[in-house]
């Protein structure tokens, strides 16, 4: 089959049946795995510096989303915004304005996978960025409630594209030796947007129509993504899935192999990809989502993906992000200036926690960090509930108010340490190349639905039952803790292709906790051999 190479524009001949025509022996596989494992790697080589530049564009996709989370929570507390639209900070109208963003995201989900599969990850980021620019223009210049909601809907529509394309691109481009921290840093950039938004809101709090200024700032990150998306190398896994083997090898050599086309790590990745990625997979059929659930292994993957999509929104974090000023009000803080100041301090603390957590992903593992974080969140909510009640009933009790605020912050830090870096990357890791874009877009749909529900319900809940709303999160987080322990496998220490062995197992969690070995690589490339005992790490 002949097609145009997206990297060079030239026609290239490629094979429709990679795994059928690419045979390797047991000895060759073990030699490749051992060579890749014994090679010394550095974080500061020219190849890695180039890679960081590419990943930053992907990271900015998270910044776009983080900016909105903080900007809406911030301007919702601004008097100028409330007066302009005649709204209260916690009401059903406020919930609708927050939720319409997630509704836009949900509506975009069916289109995101096909765009990524047909035209690549770069195209997904570019298209999403364009929608965000349009939505920002509409919302920032809104003269009535309907126009503002329309802009929010378009913003949410575009964010779905970047929220899928960005983490998928980062996960597929990240160097396998440091995939944990490099992929984990993606969602940490959520807080970059959040920090900028919170402080722009604080600076504009006294200006007439000051609520528009933070919205204008949404042009920045999305504009950078649009400008630079087409200068990025395409994902090597997408290239292999479309038969562009030569281009994929060049990308891997340039960004993972110090320019060496025969680098051990390049050879290992190319071999694993050629056996795991098909040029006839369901990603070539835009309408075909069946591969997400047609086998037991795919169903195992889908359970992890969709549960992460919901858990990542319902652990208490969404309410904290969008309704932090309202939570502070429940804790006895009524001054607009102080609420916005505390809102501005919250994001930097969470950012530091999330970056710190990303450094431990490959050391501690995904499961232990997530479960430990949930235990901390449960403890925080258990303490916040009575403290907020005391502070609300006795405004003069500054000790209760300050303690309540401290534990609200501690919740954010605890959640951010694990869930912020892990949430998007775990979804990417749990999907294979054929289903990654569609699966991530389905996860984004469930995330949007879960987010819309919690955003819409949190406003009335805080208005009517106030601090008792936290009890709901205590019970739900306990359920999440048990679910993760039973059903979520560990994904560290394996390449994306090697995770197939985990999900194919009858007990994926048990298999995932077994150490990686040469046998893992043999199973990945479907080479039959007696069990190999020489472990590689």
What is the role of each PLM region?
Residues 2-253, 278-537:
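Transmembrane-helix signature of 12-pass secondary carriers
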Residues 255-268:
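Short intracellular "coupling" helices and adjacent cytoplasmic loop segments at the cytosolic face
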Residues 266-282:
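Cytosol/matrix-facing amphipathic helices and coiled-coil assembly/linker segments
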């Amino acid at each position: 089959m002949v097609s145009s190479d997206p990297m060079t524009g030239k026609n290239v001949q490629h094979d429709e049946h990679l795994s059928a025509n690419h045979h390797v022996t047991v000895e060759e596989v073990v030699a490749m795995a051992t060579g890749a494992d014994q090679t010394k790697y550095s974080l500061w080589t020219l190849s890695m510096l180039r890679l960081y530049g590419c990943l930053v564009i992907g990271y900015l996709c998270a910044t776009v989303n983080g900016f909105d989370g903080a900007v809406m929570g911030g301007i919702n507390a601004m008097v100028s915004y409330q007066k302009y639209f005649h709204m209260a900070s916690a009401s059903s109208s406020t919930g609708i304005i927050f939720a319409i963003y997630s509704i836009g995201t949900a509506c975009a989900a069916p289109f995101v996978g096909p765009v990524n599969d047909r035209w690549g990850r770069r195209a997904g980021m570019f298209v999403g960025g364009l929608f965000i620019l349009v939505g920002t223009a509409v919302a920032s210049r809104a003269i009535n409630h309907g126009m503002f909601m329309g802009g929010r809907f378009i913003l949410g529509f575009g964010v779905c594209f970047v929220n899928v394309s960005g983490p998928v691109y980062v996960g597929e481009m990240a160097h396998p030796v440091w995939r944990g921290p490099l992929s984990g840093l993606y969602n940490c950039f959520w807080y970059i947007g959040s920090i900028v938004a919170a402080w722009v809101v604080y600076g504009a709090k006294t200006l007439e129509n000051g609520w528009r200024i933070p919205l204008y700032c949404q042009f920045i990150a999305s504009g950078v993504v649009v400008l630079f998306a087409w200068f990025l190398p395409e994902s090597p896994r997408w290239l292999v899935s479309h038969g562009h083997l030569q281009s994929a090898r060049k990308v891997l050599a340039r960004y993972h192999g110090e320019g060496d086309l025969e680098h051990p790590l390049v050879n290992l990745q190319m071999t694993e990809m050629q056996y795991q990625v098909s040029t006839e997979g369901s990603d070539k059929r835009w309408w075909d989502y069946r591969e997400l659930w047609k086998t037991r292994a795919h169903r195992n993957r889908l359970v992890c993906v969709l549960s992460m999509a919901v858990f990542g929104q319902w652990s208490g974090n969404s309410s904290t992000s969008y309704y932090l000023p309202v939570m502070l009000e429940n804790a006895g803080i009524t001054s607009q200036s102080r609420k916005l100041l505390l809102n501005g301090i919250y994001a930097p603390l969470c950012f530091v926690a999330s970056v710190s957590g990303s450094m431990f992903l490959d050391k501690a593992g995904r499961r232990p960090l997530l479960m430990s974080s949930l235990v901390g969140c449960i403890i925080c909510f258990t303490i916040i509930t009575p403290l907020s009640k005391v502070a609300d009933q006795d405004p003069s009790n500054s000790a209760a108010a300050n303690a309540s605020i401290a534990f609200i912050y501690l919740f954010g830090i605890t959640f951010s340490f694990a869930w912020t870096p892990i949430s998007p990357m775990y979804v990417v890791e749990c999907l294979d190349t054929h289903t990654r874009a569609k699966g991530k877009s389905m996860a984004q749909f469930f995330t949007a639905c879960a987010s819309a529900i919690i955003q819409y319900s949190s406003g009335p809940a805080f208005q009517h039952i106030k601090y008792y709303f936290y009890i709901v999160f205590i019970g739900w987080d306990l359920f999440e803790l048990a679910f993760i322990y039973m059903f979520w496998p560990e994904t560290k220490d394996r390449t994306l292709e090697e995770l197939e062995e985990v999900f194919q197992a009858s007990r994926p969690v048990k298999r995932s906790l077994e150490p990686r070995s040469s046998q893992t690589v043999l199973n990945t490339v479907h080479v039959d051999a007696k069990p190999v005992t020489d472990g590689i790490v």
